């Protein structure tokens, strides 16, 4: 039901959607974002990961936040099947997937670190996590222990950097395989700079109208 409401919101005649910022660039506040920029963001991610029509995308994030909304928009933009499960700490449990009537292999999923950590602890859920073709992890830091575990995963696993104002992520860090890295790489359409005191400045015109000065320090 939640994803259907999000789709209706996306398809109504208004050019904008109301979201609330996370506080990365200041005090949390309501923010009107353009639907076209949401589609731009979705296309950037889908193109980068090589997602295609008919892929299966797991929606296990609350739709109150940009991460959940953007999973729906990515599904719309790319023509993916959305597997909608109730947001919980165990999105790959038998109970969660049974409620979604899903037996399909999951192509693409976005999770927070806690969901990944919990899934790693349960053998059946760990097996399902291993089978996800493209997994992005955001909304919190990936600690060294988790990064070491994910490095051995056979498929593509990424940690994301972004915020509500950038309509989810603008940079990715590869966690799995021989290309695993300690550094985040911005998308080609994104430019970064620093302020005099070392804070990150983001210029991502396809997804954000103005340049953003964050509270994050650049190393």
Stretch-by-stretch model annotation:
Residues 35-40, 56-118:
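AMP-binding/adenylate-forming
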Residues 2-7:
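Short, small-residue-biased leader/transition segments that mark boundaries at the very start
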Residues 15-43, 50:
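Conserved AMP-binding A3 loop
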């Amino acid at each position: 039901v939640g994803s259907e409401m999000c789709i209706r919101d996306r398809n109504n005649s208004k050019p904008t959607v109301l979201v609330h910022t996370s506080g990365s660039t200041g005090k949390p506040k309501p923010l009107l974002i353009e639907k076209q920029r949401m589609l731009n963001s979705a296309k950037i991610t889908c193109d980068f990961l090589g997602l295609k029509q008919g892929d299966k995308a797991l929606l296990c994030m609350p739709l109150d936040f940009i991460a959940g909304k953007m999973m729906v928009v990515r599904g719309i933009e790319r023509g993916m099947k959305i597997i909608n499960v109730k947001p919980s700490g165990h999105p790959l449990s038998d109970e969660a997937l049974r409620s979604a009537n899903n037996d399909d292999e999951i192509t693409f999923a976005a999770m927070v670190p806690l969901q990944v950590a919990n899934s790693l602890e349960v053998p059946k859920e760990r097996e399902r996590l291993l089978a996800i073709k493209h997994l992005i992890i955001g909304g919190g830091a990936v600690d060294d222990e988790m990064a070491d575990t994910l490095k051995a995963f056979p498929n593509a696993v990424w940690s994301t950097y972004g915020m509500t104002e950038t309509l989810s992520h603008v940079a990715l860090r590869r966690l799995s395989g021989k290309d695993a890295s300690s550094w985040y790489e911005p998308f080609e359409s994104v430019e970064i700079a620093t302020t005099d005191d070392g804070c990150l400045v983001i210029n991502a015109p396809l997804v954000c109208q103005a340049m953003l000065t964050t509270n994050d320090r650049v190393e």
